[in-house]
Protein backbone atom coordinates (compact mmCIF):
# COMPACT_ATOMS: atom_id res chain seq x y z
CA UNK A 1 0.00 0.00 0.00
CA UNK A 2 1.09 3.56 -0.52
CA UNK A 3 2.30 5.08 2.70
CA UNK A 4 0.13 7.97 3.94
CA UNK A 5 1.85 11.26 3.26
CA UNK A 6 4.77 9.76 1.44
CA UNK A 7 5.13 8.34 -2.03
CA UNK A 8 8.29 9.91 -3.37
CA UNK A 9 10.87 8.18 -5.50
CA UNK A 10 14.65 8.42 -5.18
CA UNK A 11 15.91 11.54 -3.50
CA UNK A 12 12.33 12.27 -2.43
CA UNK A 13 11.50 13.56 -5.91
CA UNK A 14 8.93 11.85 -8.08
CA UNK A 15 8.16 14.64 -10.53
CA UNK A 16 9.65 14.54 -14.00
CA UNK A 17 12.48 16.94 -14.67
CA UNK A 18 13.14 17.91 -18.28
CA UNK A 19 15.79 15.58 -19.69
CA UNK A 20 15.81 13.39 -16.60
CA UNK A 21 13.53 10.40 -16.15
CA UNK A 22 14.00 7.86 -13.38
CA UNK A 23 12.32 4.64 -12.38
CA UNK A 24 12.72 2.66 -9.20
CA UNK A 25 15.72 0.37 -9.50
CA UNK A 26 17.55 2.48 -12.06
CA UNK A 27 20.95 3.99 -11.21
CA UNK A 28 21.06 7.72 -10.78
CA UNK A 29 23.02 9.50 -13.53
CA UNK A 30 26.32 10.82 -12.25
CA UNK A 31 25.76 9.51 -8.73
CA UNK A 32 28.44 6.85 -8.73
CA UNK A 33 28.48 3.14 -9.62
CA UNK A 34 25.94 0.65 -8.32
CA UNK A 35 23.73 3.31 -6.79
CA UNK A 36 20.10 2.27 -6.80
CA UNK A 37 16.85 3.15 -5.16
CA UNK A 38 16.51 0.75 -2.27
CA UNK A 39 14.91 0.12 1.07
CA UNK A 40 11.81 2.20 0.44
CA UNK A 41 10.92 5.26 -1.65
CA UNK A 42 13.17 8.21 -1.08
CA UNK A 43 16.27 6.31 -0.05
CA UNK A 44 19.29 5.14 -1.98
CA UNK A 45 21.37 2.08 -1.28
CA UNK A 46 24.81 0.82 -2.21
CA UNK A 47 25.70 -2.62 -3.44
CA UNK A 48 28.33 -4.53 -1.51
CA UNK A 49 30.61 -4.46 -4.57
CA UNK A 50 30.90 -0.68 -4.55
CA UNK A 51 34.42 0.55 -3.86
CA UNK A 52 34.72 4.20 -2.82
CA UNK A 53 38.29 4.23 -4.11
CA UNK A 54 36.86 3.91 -7.63
CA UNK A 55 34.92 7.15 -7.30
CA UNK A 56 36.44 10.55 -8.04
CA UNK A 57 34.53 12.03 -5.10
CA UNK A 58 36.43 9.79 -2.69
CA UNK A 59 39.59 11.89 -3.01
CA UNK A 60 37.62 15.08 -2.51
CA UNK A 61 35.77 13.69 0.52
CA UNK A 62 38.91 12.46 2.27
CA UNK A 63 40.55 15.86 1.78
CA UNK A 64 37.79 17.42 3.86
CA UNK A 65 37.07 14.58 6.29
CA UNK A 66 38.85 14.16 9.59
CA UNK A 67 41.24 11.37 10.47
CA UNK A 68 38.27 9.15 11.31
CA UNK A 69 37.10 9.31 7.68
CA UNK A 70 33.94 11.22 8.57
CA UNK A 71 32.76 14.82 8.41
CA UNK A 72 31.00 16.87 11.06
CA UNK A 73 28.60 19.71 10.29
CA UNK A 74 31.30 22.36 9.82
CA UNK A 75 33.34 20.08 7.56
CA UNK A 76 30.22 19.19 5.59
CA UNK A 77 29.39 22.87 5.16
CA UNK A 78 32.90 23.55 3.86
CA UNK A 79 32.74 20.51 1.59
CA UNK A 80 29.40 21.48 0.04
CA UNK A 81 30.44 25.12 -0.34
CA UNK A 82 33.67 24.17 -2.10
CA UNK A 83 31.84 21.70 -4.33
CA UNK A 84 29.57 24.42 -5.69
CA UNK A 85 26.50 22.21 -5.45
CA UNK A 86 24.42 25.24 -4.45
CA UNK A 87 25.18 26.77 -7.84
CA UNK A 88 24.09 30.40 -7.94
CA UNK A 89 22.18 30.03 -4.68
CA UNK A 90 23.63 30.98 -1.29
CA UNK A 91 25.72 28.26 0.40
CA UNK A 92 24.05 26.03 2.97
CA UNK A 93 23.91 27.32 6.53
CA UNK A 94 25.58 25.44 9.37
CA UNK A 95 22.17 24.56 10.83
CA UNK A 96 21.04 23.02 7.54
CA UNK A 97 24.25 20.99 7.43
CA UNK A 98 23.57 19.78 10.98
CA UNK A 99 20.16 18.41 10.05
CA UNK A 100 21.58 16.89 6.85
CA UNK A 101 23.88 14.82 9.03
CA UNK A 102 21.05 13.98 11.44
CA UNK A 103 18.92 12.75 8.53
CA UNK A 104 21.47 10.05 7.66
CA UNK A 105 23.17 9.55 11.02
CA UNK A 106 21.93 6.00 11.59
CA UNK A 107 24.70 5.19 14.07
CA UNK A 108 24.20 8.45 16.02
CA UNK A 109 27.81 9.59 15.83
CA UNK A 110 26.93 13.14 14.84
CA UNK A 111 29.08 12.70 11.74
CA UNK A 112 28.75 11.49 8.18
CA UNK A 113 30.76 8.79 6.43
CA UNK A 114 31.44 8.56 2.71
CA UNK A 115 28.45 6.37 1.80
CA UNK A 116 26.16 8.70 3.73
CA UNK A 117 27.76 11.65 1.95
CA UNK A 118 27.07 10.05 -1.42
CA UNK A 119 23.48 9.43 -0.41
CA UNK A 120 23.13 13.05 0.63
CA UNK A 121 24.74 14.23 -2.62
CA UNK A 122 22.17 12.32 -4.67
CA UNK A 123 19.29 13.76 -2.65
CA UNK A 124 20.66 17.31 -2.88
CA UNK A 125 20.98 17.08 -6.64
CA UNK A 126 17.39 15.88 -6.97
CA UNK A 127 16.10 18.59 -4.63
CA UNK A 128 18.10 21.23 -6.49
CA UNK A 129 16.65 20.13 -9.83
CA UNK A 130 13.21 20.29 -8.25
CA UNK A 131 13.84 23.81 -6.94
CA UNK A 132 15.19 25.02 -10.27
CA UNK A 133 12.13 23.63 -12.03
CA UNK A 134 9.73 25.66 -9.89
CA UNK A 135 12.01 28.74 -9.66
CA UNK A 136 11.08 29.74 -13.19
CA UNK A 137 12.06 33.39 -12.81
CA UNK A 138 15.49 32.36 -11.43
CA UNK A 139 15.06 34.67 -8.46
CA UNK A 140 16.64 32.18 -6.06
CA UNK A 141 13.38 31.92 -4.15
CA UNK A 142 10.01 30.25 -4.62
CA UNK A 143 6.59 31.40 -3.46
CA UNK A 144 4.48 29.60 -0.89
CA UNK A 145 2.21 27.94 -3.45
CA UNK A 146 5.29 26.71 -5.33
CA UNK A 147 6.65 25.08 -2.17
CA UNK A 148 3.32 23.30 -1.75
CA UNK A 149 3.61 22.16 -5.36
CA UNK A 150 7.15 20.91 -4.79
CA UNK A 151 6.12 18.95 -1.69
CA UNK A 152 3.33 17.30 -3.68
CA UNK A 153 5.76 16.45 -6.49
CA UNK A 154 7.99 14.70 -3.95
CA UNK A 155 5.10 12.35 -3.26
CA UNK A 156 3.90 13.67 0.09
CA UNK A 157 0.12 13.74 0.46
CA UNK A 158 -0.48 16.34 3.14
CA UNK A 159 -3.55 18.25 4.25
CA UNK A 160 -3.87 21.95 3.39
CA UNK A 161 -3.45 22.74 7.10
CA UNK A 162 -0.15 20.84 7.29
CA UNK A 163 1.12 22.42 4.09
CA UNK A 164 0.23 25.87 5.41
CA UNK A 165 2.13 25.19 8.63
CA UNK A 166 5.21 24.07 6.69
CA UNK A 167 5.09 27.14 4.46
CA UNK A 168 4.84 29.45 7.47
CA UNK A 169 7.83 27.75 9.07
CA UNK A 170 10.16 28.01 6.06
CA UNK A 171 9.07 31.20 4.29
CA UNK A 172 10.42 34.72 4.78
CA UNK A 173 8.05 37.46 3.68
CA UNK A 174 6.17 34.95 1.56
CA UNK A 175 9.31 33.62 -0.19
CA UNK A 176 11.33 30.46 0.42
CA UNK A 177 15.08 30.57 -0.18
CA UNK A 178 17.03 27.55 -1.44
CA UNK A 179 18.67 26.84 1.93
CA UNK A 180 15.29 26.87 3.70
CA UNK A 181 13.79 24.73 0.95
CA UNK A 182 16.50 22.10 1.40
CA UNK A 183 16.09 22.24 5.18
CA UNK A 184 12.38 21.58 4.66
CA UNK A 185 13.13 18.61 2.38
CA UNK A 186 15.61 17.18 4.88
CA UNK A 187 13.18 17.40 7.79
CA UNK A 188 10.29 15.95 5.80
CA UNK A 189 12.40 12.97 4.83
CA UNK A 190 13.99 12.47 8.25
CA UNK A 191 10.76 12.76 10.24
CA UNK A 192 8.86 10.55 7.79
CA UNK A 193 11.61 7.96 8.10
CA UNK A 194 11.46 8.18 11.91
CA UNK A 195 7.67 7.75 11.87
CA UNK A 196 7.57 5.00 9.28
CA UNK A 197 10.10 2.81 11.07
CA UNK A 198 7.63 2.68 13.97
CA UNK A 199 4.49 2.32 11.87
CA UNK A 200 4.71 -1.46 11.67
CA UNK A 201 1.22 -1.88 10.23
CA UNK A 202 1.71 0.94 7.70
CA UNK A 203 -1.53 2.61 8.76
CA UNK A 204 -0.22 6.09 9.50
CA UNK A 205 -0.72 5.62 13.25
CA UNK A 206 2.05 5.23 15.83
CA UNK A 207 2.23 5.16 19.64
CA UNK A 208 5.34 6.90 20.97
CA UNK A 209 7.11 6.72 24.26
CA UNK A 210 7.87 10.30 25.31
CA UNK A 211 11.67 9.92 25.24
CA UNK A 212 11.54 8.06 21.92
CA UNK A 213 9.65 11.01 20.48
CA UNK A 214 12.19 13.47 21.88
CA UNK A 215 15.16 11.47 20.59
CA UNK A 216 13.65 11.32 17.13
CA UNK A 217 12.68 14.96 16.83
CA UNK A 218 15.18 16.92 18.93
CA UNK A 219 18.12 15.53 16.94
CA UNK A 220 16.76 16.72 13.59
Swiss-Prot record:
GO terms for cellular component: cytosol; plasma membrane. Residues 51-86, 92-127, 122-157, 158-193 form the EF-hand domain. InterPro entries: EF-hand-dom_pair, EF_Hand_1_Ca_BS, EF_hand_dom. Ca(2+) 1 binds at residues 105, 107, 109, 111, 116. GO terms for molecular function: calcium ion binding; protein heterodimerization activity; protein homodimerization activity. It is found in: Cytoplasm; Cytoplasmic granule membrane. Its main location: cytoplasm. Ca(2+) 2 binds at residues 135, 137, 139, 141, 146. Disruption phenotype: No visible phenotype. Not essential for normal resistance to microbial infections. Grancalcin-deficient neutrophils exhibit decreased adhesion to fibronectin, and a strongly reduced number of focal adhesion complexes. Keywords: Calcium, Cytoplasm, Membrane, Metal-binding, Repeat. It is a peripheral membrane protein. Calcium-binding protein that may play a role in the adhesion of neutrophils to fibronectin. May play a role in the formation of focal adhesions. Homodimer. Interacts with SRI and LCP1. This protein has been shown to bind calcium with high affinity. This is Grancalcin. It comes from Mus musculus (Mouse).
